[in-house]
């Protein structure tokens, strides 16, 4: 049975970040039951295996910033920018695979920095 997963979660208040970026403002969470884990740790844990589209956009005031999209703590994408940048990847996820975003940069909050995860198959 195909279970559709759709998640949009954005950064709360802006702050300097060195490590996992916490996206605390959950806007959409269809098919996701572990929303407290995402809010508290910034880590998405896959509950339903499938093919996923993962999209991240980050806004920062720093002229040279970098962030990493991680699957099970391994880099699957990197974003470099002087103000706003986005990264989109497609990944096969199995149950308990994790997705997180890390970096050492100032991250603007609200809808200026968000993580989107969509199960496409």
Model-derived regions, located:
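Extracellular jelly-roll beta-sandwich "head" domains, especially the C-terminal globular C1q domain
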Residues: 1-121
């Amino acid at each position: 049975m195909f279970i559709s997963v759709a998640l949009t979660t954005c950064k709360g208040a802006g702050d300097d970040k060195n490590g996992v970026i916490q996206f605390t403002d959950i806007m959409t969470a269809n098919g996701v039951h572990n929303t407290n884990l995402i809010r508290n740790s910034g880590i998405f844990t896959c509950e339903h295996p499938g093919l996923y589209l993962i999209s991240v956009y980050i806004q920062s005031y720093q002229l040279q910033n970098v962030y990493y999209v991680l699957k099970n703590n391994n880099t699957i994408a990197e974003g470099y920018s002087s103000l706003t940048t986005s990264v989109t990847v497609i990944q096969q996820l199995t149950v308990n695979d994790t997705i997180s975003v890390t970096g050492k940069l100032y991250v603007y909050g609200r809808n200026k920095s968000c993580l989107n995860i969509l199960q496409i198959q």
